[in-house]
């Protein structure tokens, strides 16, 4: 039987259509996925992301452990509360998961990992933490609400105490702070400003209801997916998995190659892949009628006249732009146009950077 988050009852009260999402009963939408999408782009919307896993790591060698575990380098994290995004790789350079890591003190870091990969993540982390005597605490006592949109921070702040307002004032992106019983982070999965707020499970329903009263619109998994795709953000199991290199998933920027003497899991394989070359993740835009869908083939002719083929990893109709967009993994050498096979039709598409909307505006 699928698990329920502490906000399940709130979702049903708000009229949600609930679906099983990787073993969790989650809201797909509350009546109109399109309205929820536009609310986040133009005002403020919120998502229950309590199905994600928060993991606290403690011990004097925690930083050393994370420098080995992750492809990005937590040595960059020097200010308490600062966060970074990273892949957690296997020895062959495949992506076990993508995650966010927060630095609090030298012996206290926090990870936020995906729900679908929870068990394998925890097993992998535990397996490698033992050598470093790192203590692992899974924070199942916390709920997580993402409040996103141009007015999200202002509306959320109406619920904060004076201490919480002071703590978050002027906070830059990718920071988190514990203030009272809330952990408030300037992170998200929509391409908009906002907060991801963790709180004790018993406080979640009251906080959700207060956000509704403050004019924040509940939004479901459907809008979350179209928003993240417009923002060019990867979804685990579609843009990457354990067989896909971060170099082929537009995650090259998350690999800290320097210092050259830092060992991390997957480094040797990545160096070979970088030398040999990999597929690349690109954006596709189709302004003609139709919708680009996952797993459709993408064909093009390279500079040598060879026919090459890739595949759409995520595709949808963009509510913000009014036409279809997609992310696709293709061989190197693609030009500015390609062909996507939709049923028996060959549809022309423009090839772009893998990002379409940022802060509510089209990315040229």
UniProtKB/Swiss-Prot annotation:
Catalyzed reactions: N(6)-[(R)-S(8)-aminomethyldihydrolipoyl]-L-lysyl-[protein] + (6S)-5,6,7,8-tetrahydrofolate = N(6)-[(R)-dihydrolipoyl]-L-lysyl-[protein] + (6R)-5,10-methylene-5,6,7,8-tetrahydrofolate + NH4(+)
Enzyme type, top EC level: transferase
Keyword Nucleotide-binding: no
Organism domain of life: Bacteria
InterPro entries: GCS_T, GCS_T_bac, GCST_C, GCV_T_N, GcvT/YgfZ/DmdA, GcvT/YgfZ_C, TrmE/GcvT_dom1
Keywords: Aminotransferase, Transferase
Any GO MF annotation of the entry: transaminase activity
GO cellular component: cytosol; glycine cleavage complex
GO biological process: glycine decarboxylation via glycine cleavage system
Record EC number: 2.1.2.10
Keyword Chaperone listed: no
UniProt xrefs under Pfam families: GCV_T (PF01571), GCV_T_C (PF08669)
Purpose of the protein: The glycine cleavage system catalyzes the degradation of glycine.
Quaternary structure, from the entry: The glycine cleavage system is composed of four proteins: P, T, L and H.
Family of this protein: Belongs to the GcvT family.
Annotated protein name in UniProt: Aminomethyltransferase
Gene giving rise to this polypeptide: gcvT
